[in-house]
Amino acid sequence: MWTFAIVLAFLLIGLDEGEALDGYPLSKNNYCKIYCPNTEVCKDTCKRRAGATDGECRWDGCYCFNVAPDTKMYPGELPCH
């Protein structure tokens, strides 16, 4: 029983790891921030919660954008200012 609790705790802690500041963080269910070169990639990687600069991939409340490599991004921040 304790082993299950410890494994579950590590899994929950690991969900918040992997964020980056270089514009290419890991995908998350609700805070998906992935480099999206085009609409097709956005749809596949962000489950239609995406935004690409080609103008074909726009949804409200999206967290996935085509951003410059030097754009600083933080968890939960929209990089479209």
UniProtKB/Swiss-Prot annotation:
MF term (GO), any: sodium channel inhibitor activity
Annotated ranges, domain LCN-type CS-alpha/beta: 21-81
Signal peptide: 1-20
Protein name in the entry: Toxin TdNa10
Cysteine pairings via disulfide bonds: 32-80, 36-57, 42-62, 46-64
Pfam assignment, any one: Toxin_3
Keywords assigned: Disulfide bond, Ion channel impairing toxin, Neurotoxin, Secreted, Signal, Toxin, Voltage-gated sodium channel impairing toxin
Function field: Alpha toxins bind voltage-independently at site-3 of sodium channels (Nav) and inhibit the inactivation of the activated channels, thereby blocking neuronal transmission. This toxin binds, in vitro, to sodium channels and inhibits the inactivation of the activated channels. Seems not toxic to mice, crickets and sweet-water shrimps.
Annotated InterPro entries: LCN-type_CS_alpha_beta_dom, Scorpion_toxin-like_sf, Scorpion_toxinL/defensin
GO cellular component: extracellular region
Compartments where found: Secreted
UniProt main location, coarse: secreted
Written domain comment of the UniProt record: Has the structural arrangement of an alpha-helix connected to antiparallel beta-sheets by disulfide bonds (CS-alpha/beta).
Family: Belongs to the long (4 C-C) scorpion toxin superfamily. Sodium channel inhibitor family. Beta subfamily.
Keyword Lipid metabolism: no
Tissue: Expressed by the venom gland.
